[in-house]
Regions:
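Structured catalytic core of nucleotide-sugar glycosyltransferases
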Residues: 1-120
Length: 120
């Protein structure tokens, strides 16, 4: 597995289809060996429903549902524990981070860096 994208999900059910679309478009430019890990932090919006729909349509998406709201850091940690990628991207679910930036970050990583990060 080349890339794992770990996304804690809370309060962004409506953004998930667009997030998935943009991620798959971006990641497919880099490799076909990727996974998207969506960790539902027991969101009251019932984001889990949307995660299940996306998982059923795309085998590269893995969904995990936490039994209660543990918070963003623990949701990220749960996703990291399940990730298999050589490179791991952590991003928010509300599209405040551009999925398209992953392409640029990955290209920079291929120059021999151990860690690559972006800021706005």
């Amino acid at each position: 597995m080349d890339i794992s994208v770990v996304i804690p999900v809370y309060g962004c059910k409506a953004a998930l289809p667009e997030l998935h679309r943009r991620l798959t478009e971006s990641l497919s430019q880099i490799t076909d060996k990727y996974e998207i890990i969506l960790v539902d932090d027991n969101c009251p919006q019932n984001s889990w429903e949307e995660i299940v729909k996306i998982c059923q349509k795309d085998e590269k998406v893995k969904g995990f549902h936490l039994s209660r709201n543990f918070g963003q850091i623990r949701a990220i940690t749960a996703g990291l524990d399940k990730s298999k990628g050589d490179w791991i991207v952590v991003m928010d679910c509300d599209l405040q981070d551009r999925p398209e930036a992953i392409v640029e970050l990955y290209q920079k990583a291929q120059e021999g860096y151990d860690v690559v990060f972006a800021r706005r």
